[in-house]
Amino acid sequence: MKDQIIYKRSIHQHLKTLLATVVLTGLALCSKAQLNPFQNMYFQNQYMYNPAMAGLDKVLNLNLNYRQQWSNFPGAPKTGSLTADFQPADKVGVGLNVTDDQSGLIRSTRVMATYAYHLPLSDQTEQLSFGVSLGVNDSRVNYDAINGDVTDQEIAKYNQLKAYADGDFGVAYTSDKLYIGGALPNLKAAFFKNSDSRFDADRLLFITSASYKISLEGTGQGFVLAPLAAFRVVKGYKDIVDAGANFTMNDYGLYLQGIYHSNESMGLGFGLDQTNYAFSFNYNLETGQIRNYTGGAFELGIKFKLFQKSYNKQ
C-alpha cells in the first residue's frame, strides 16, 4: 500500500514537471506572437491601434481579421479582430474595436467604443485628428482547454478577477500622401500599474508610425510605393522598431507589402483592394532562434466598404 502511494506521488510529480515544461514553452510561443500585431494595422487599417483614425472617410468600414500560429502546438495563440468605423457628421468619427485573443489557457476579450475629431488644416487634404476609446477588458482561463484538475484554486482565483475599464488615446496627421500617428493604448496599465494583479505580459504601452506615398510616375499603371517606419514600447520587453513598405498597383486593385520587426521577425503580405471590398493575406515568419519551434503565423483579413452611395448623395 505504501509503495502504491509513493508510486502515485512519483507519477503526479512527473506529470507536474511535464505540464510546467509544456506551459513554459507555450508561453514563449504566445509571448513572441503577441509582440507581432496584425500586419493590416500598418497600412490598411490604422484604426486597429490608433483611435484618431476612426471615421476618417465618409463610408462605413467593416474589417474582420483572424490570426493564428502556423503550428499544432497545444495552446498556440490565435486572435480575432473586428473594427467598424464611419463618419456620422462633419469632422466627427465613431468606431467599434473588438479583439478576442487566446494564448494557451488564457482568453482575453477587449471591446472599445471610439470617438474621434478631425480638424481640417490649410490644405483640404490635410487633417489633424484626435481620438479616444473607452471600453472593457476581460481575461479568463478557458476551462475547455484544461487537461487536468479544473477545480484548482489558482484557476478559480484568476477567473474571479472582474472585467475592468480601459481606454486608448491617439493623434494623427494625415494628407493625401503623408501619415504620422501615435497612440497610447491600454491606459489603465500605463497610469494605474498596481490596480490589477492579473498576468499581463507584453502589453503595448506606446506606438507611433509614419508612412509616405510616392507615386511612381512614368509607369502608367498607377503604381504607388509607401515606405513606413514605426516604433513600439512594450511592457517587459525591449523597444521594437518596424520598417517596411507597401507597393500598390491601383489600376489592378492589388498591393504587396513587407515589414521587418527588430524582435527578429518579418511579415510578408498581399491583398486585393476593390471599390466595395478588400481581401488580404499576411504571413509572419520568425528569423530568430524561435523559428525552430514554430512555422510562423498567418493572417487573413476582409474589409467591406458600405453605404458609399448614401454618403455621395449628401
For each predicted feature, which ranges?
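Bacterial N-terminal signal peptides that target proteins for export
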Residues: 2-19
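Cleavable N-terminal signal peptides
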Residues: 20-21, 31
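Subset of outer-membrane beta-barrel
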Residues: 34-314
